[in-house]
């Protein structure tokens, strides 16, 4: 349907340009419009993940909501900001004056460049590999020029500047995102009560976002809106005025409403999270309670307490986290051992057998059924949730809502630990038999299902029951309780940091529920800002060669001074939106979830700083890569949160893809250009 519309559009365009001096090459113009639409489709399927990937990954918006918002802002951004970068792509990379007497070669080169870029981006989207659309079109443009005119046809000085920008853009974006997140964490996230400072900062955040966005639109000089006639001082005055007005609106209307909403959420959920069950028990000082295991066996899992003696305080708050993931079944009551409440000064070895009281007075209970398993089978059983599974998304979303200390769970819950090698969260599900991990009805079980190894095996073996909606399971031999404790300590990274609450913060640096509410709207706004900037910058990747093709056909002048037509930018924006709806979810999953866990606060920092970098580059006509900016910001903020929170293996793969994209798209474009030059023309 979309391609039929593209064909009808090209027919209409061809009819209006029928009086041009190159009427014999009308077929090339029509072919160029079709390929340009495919290229725009591929840009939407791959590059749009940069804009809303983090918002979807943090759970702030759904995929459908992201597609709707991106469709609006990508299109508007392509119309208002895209013209200037299109000029750089059209004239900045090659010397178009060399084609004065061979206009048909320039037209063929434009078609070749679009084809080479589109093919490689479609392949990359199929492989869920985020690449740079700017890299593609630059490499393809150089490829056809080398075939058409040799090395003299390329402006190598401009190419060097562009290559430098590919490395400078992630560095600058990363620095800006890191500074912003550092300030947010220092003045908001790390406060005992983050709400007051967060509400005070809201007007500033909104004002900066709106002011920068408006300045970008007006400074670019969108002819459609008459902004090209505004002087610089007028642009600055209008932008600052609108930013101040927005700040006042937020301060007097949005902040009070947000404060009331947060208060309602806290009142309706005393535990500060819908996942938590908070129990307030009044107990007298110096009172000691001793319960035997036989007495506990008849109690519910939530009230299970071991035989340890604990001095109880006047008011003790016990918080537990309950996760319900997929079709998981709780272990039978008889397979669970009771939790034990221990003193705050206890070692990690003792903590593995009971519960720990955090410095803030909260009593966190640990799930404990390992001893029972070891006594019966001599094995320690654990299951890993794969980062690409459906459960990982649900688990990650719930981790964002739960506070750090509460994520350890109670006697019926699953303690969480970090698996660095896969960059995924791990559930140590104690007391749960392997056969409780059953594939859902209709799930694929083909070659992805490997031979099962049951807990009574003598040697260490890995079990894989893994597709995108199932689990990675593992079974390890552990012959003594001390060995088990050492392995768990090493896996959690606690080491000798006994009783350290900062180690928990390092692993579970998640937003508090009220902070999540505070930053949700901001992340949506900054994501829209990023989508707007992306539309302005990356629509040129699809439309730049088409603009050259159309203007050469229409005027016969390779160095035409005619401004980029607005309807051509709109044409590219529509293609980008369709690509997003049809195929965008593949790369969104890679960018938004796999590189590093995203929270609303970190997502806001990533979006605002990277979008600011892209918009500035668009305004000075420098074709940078939005992929590089976003990856640089994600890695920078993830590294600040925890060095082990970043999937460095995935980052390495993305970094390698930055280098292979230019030559691959260039080779494809050069091959098509050779066919045009030596066979067709």
UniProtKB/Swiss-Prot annotation:
The modification Phosphoserine is found at residues 269, 273. The chain crosses the membrane at residues 25-45, 66-86, 106-126, 162-182, 207-227, 234-254, 515-535, 562-582, 604-624, 654-674. InterPro entries: Phos_transporter. This is Sodium-dependent phosphate transporter 1. It is a multi-pass membrane protein. One of its GO terms (cellular component) is plasma membrane. It catalyses: 2 Na(+)(out) + phosphate(out) = 2 Na(+)(in) + phosphate(in). Residues 275-290 have a biased composition (Basic and acidic residues). Sodium-phosphate symporter which preferentially transports the monovalent form of phosphate with a stoichiometry of two sodium ions per phosphate ion. May play a role in extracellular matrix and cartilage calcification as well as in vascular calcification. Essential for cell proliferation but this function is independent of its phosphate transporter activity. Keywords: Cell membrane, Membrane, Phosphate transport, Phosphoprotein, Receptor, Symport, Transmembrane, Transmembrane helix, Transport. Ectopic expression of feline SLC20A1 in guinea pig cells which are not permissive to Feline leukemia virus subgroup B (FeLV-B) confers susceptibility to FeLV-B infection. The lineage of its organism: Eukaryota, Metazoa, Chordata, Craniata, Vertebrata.
């Amino acid at each position: 349907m979309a391609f039929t519309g593209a064909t009808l559009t090209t027919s209409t365009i061809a009819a209006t340009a029928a009086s041009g001096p190159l009427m014999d090459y009308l077929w090339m113009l029509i072919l160029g419009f079709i390929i340009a639409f495919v290229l725009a489709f591929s840009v939407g399927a791959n590059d749009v993940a940069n804009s809303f990937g983090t918002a979807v990954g943090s759970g702030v918006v759904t995929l459908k909501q992201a597609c709707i918002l991106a469709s609006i802002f990508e299109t508007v951004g392509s119309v208002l900001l895209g013209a200037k970068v299109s000029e750089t792509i059209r004239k900045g990379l090659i010397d178009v004056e060399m084609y004065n007497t061979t206009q048909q070669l320039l037209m063929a080169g434009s078609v070749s460049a679009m084809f080479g870029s589109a093919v490689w981006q479609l392949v990359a989207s199929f492989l869920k590999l985020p690449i740079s659309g700017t890299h593609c079109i630059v490499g393809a443009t150089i490829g056809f020029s080398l075939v058409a005119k040799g090395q003299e046809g390329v402006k190598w000085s401009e190419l060097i500047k562009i290559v430098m920008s590919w490395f400078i853009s992630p560095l600058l974006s990363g620095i800006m995102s890191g500074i912003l997140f550092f300030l947010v964490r220092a003045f908001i996230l790390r406060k005992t009560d983050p709400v007051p400072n967060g509400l005070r900062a809201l007007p500033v955040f909104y004002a900066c976002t709106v002011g920068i966005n408006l300045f970008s639109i007006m400074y670019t000089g969108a002819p459609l809106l008459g902004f090209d006639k505004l002087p610089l001082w007028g642009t600055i005055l209008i932008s600052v005025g609108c930013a101040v007005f927005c700040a006042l609106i937020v301060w007097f209307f949005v902040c009070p409403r947000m404060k009331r909403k947060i208060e309602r959420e806290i009142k309706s959920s005393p535990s500060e999270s819908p996942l938590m069950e908070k129990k307030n028990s009044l107990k007298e000082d110096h009172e000691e309670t001793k319960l035997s295991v036989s007495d506990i066996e008849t109690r519910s899992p939530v009230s299970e307490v071991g035989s340890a003696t604990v001095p109880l305080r006047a008011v003790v708050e016990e918080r537990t986290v309950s996760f319900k993931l997929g079709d998981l079944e709780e272990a039978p009551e008889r397979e669970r051992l009771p939790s034990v409440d221990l003193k705050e000064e206890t070692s990690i070895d003792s903590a593995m057998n009971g519960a720990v009281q955090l410095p803030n007075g909260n009593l966190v209970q640990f799930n404990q059924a390992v001893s029972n398993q070891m006594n019966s089978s001599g094995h320690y059983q654990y299951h890993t949730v794969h980062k690409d599974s459906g459960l990982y998304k649900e688990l990650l979303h719930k981790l964002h809502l739960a506070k750090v200390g509460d994520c350890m769970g109670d006697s019926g819950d699953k303690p969480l630990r970090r698996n660095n090698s896969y960059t995924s969260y791990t559930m140590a599900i104690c007391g749960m038999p392997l056969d409780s991990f059953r594939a859902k009805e209709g799930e694929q079980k083909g070659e992805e299902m490997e031979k099962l190894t049951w807990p009574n095996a003598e040697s260490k073996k890995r079990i894989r029951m893994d597709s995108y909606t199932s689990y990675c399971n593992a079974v390890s031999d552990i012959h003594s309780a001390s060995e088990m404790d050492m392995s768990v300590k090493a896996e959690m990274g606690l080491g000798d940091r006994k009783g350290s609450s900062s180690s928990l913060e390092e692993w579970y640096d998640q937003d508090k529920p009220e902070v999540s509410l505070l930053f949700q709207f901001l992340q949506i706004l900054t994501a829209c800002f990023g989508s707007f900037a992306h539309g302005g910058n990356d629509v040129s990747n699809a439309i730049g060669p088409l603009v050259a093709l159309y203007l050469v056909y229409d005027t016969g002048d390779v160095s035409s001074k005619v401004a980029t037509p607005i309807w051509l930018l709109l044409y590219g924006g529509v293609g980008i939106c369709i690509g997003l709806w049809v195929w965008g979810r593949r790369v969104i999953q890679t960018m938004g979830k796999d590189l590093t866990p995203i929270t609303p606060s970190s997502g806001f920092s990533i979006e605002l700083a990277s979008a600011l970098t892209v918009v500035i580059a668009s305004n000075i006509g420098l074709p940078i890569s939005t992929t590089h900016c976003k990856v640089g910001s994600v890695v920078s903020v993830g590294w600040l949160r925890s060095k082990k929170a970043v999937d460095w293996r995935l980052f390495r793969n993305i970094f390698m893809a930055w280098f292979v994209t230019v030559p691959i798209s260039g080779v494809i474009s050069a091959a098509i250009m050779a066919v045009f030059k030596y066979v067709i023309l």
